[in-house]
Amino acid sequence: GLIVFGVFGMALCQYTYFRSIALAGAGIATVLQYLAPSMIIIYLLVRYGKRPSKGEMVSVILALVGAICLMGNGDGLSIESFPMAVLVWGLLSAVGVAVYSISPVDLLYKYGTLPIVGFGMLISGIVAAILFHQPNSYAVWDVWTVIGCFNVIFLGTIVSFNAYLEGVKRIGAVPGSILSSIEPISAAFFGWAFLGNEFSLLGLIGMAMIIATVVIIAWDRQRT
């Protein structure tokens, strides 16, 4: 379970997501990754016969459409020069999210979130070092490079993975993966705060849809 989580969950998701961004930009890569909740629902239905609730189905649709609207807020989502290869990488990133949402659940209950995430990162790091070893680096290391690496490693990986999987342990893979769709809102907010990006009506509609998923999931859990 831990090997599957580290290799086909964390490592696969991280590499394919950044690969998608490199090919088509963050907008399309993010939207494709948010197909993961649908994949999780299909897997649980086929494997365990677990039918999704009406709230979960509505939330999946709202989260995906909301992400599309939000990523299309400015110039973030464009299919004019859309390489078909990004479809493969984007779907693989969604598979990675589905795998790391489902595979470690029993381990999380048994050992806790932090040890599982730590060993998962260790395994994925070893795999990455073997497959993508680069003895020579051409990166220009300055203060901004260090800050960027810190943000990606600590905030974007360590904190986010631990918070996400703790949520999955508490409420389950489907609602946890749906609620993670709040990520595009934070990206849009920081883009507005630090980069001067503006919000369009489409972007605000997308935000409202994503926030609605939080309300629906909370209401759905109170009913069950």
Please place each PLM-identified region on the residue numbering.
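Transmembrane alpha-helical segments that form core, pore/gating elements
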Residues: 40-42, 46, 60, 76-135
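Hydrophobic/aromatic residues within transmembrane alpha-helices
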Residues: 20, 32-33, 46-52, 107, ...
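Specific alpha-helical transmembrane segments that line the substrate/conduction pathway
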Residues: 18-51, 93, 173-192
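Loop-to-transmembrane-helix transition segments
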Residues: 1-16, 60, 84-95, 140-159, ...
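Specific transmembrane alpha-helical segments of multi-pass solute transporters/efflux pumps
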Residues: 1-27, 33, 69, 153-171
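Hydrophobic transmembrane alpha-helices of multi-pass small-molecule transport proteins
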Residues: 52-74, 128, 181, 190, ...
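Membrane-interface helix termini and inter-helical loops of multi-pass transporters
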Residues: 19-22, 71-83, 132-149, 192-201
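Hydrophobic/small/kink-forming positions within alpha-helical transmembrane segments
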Residues: 7-11, 15, 37-42, 68, ...
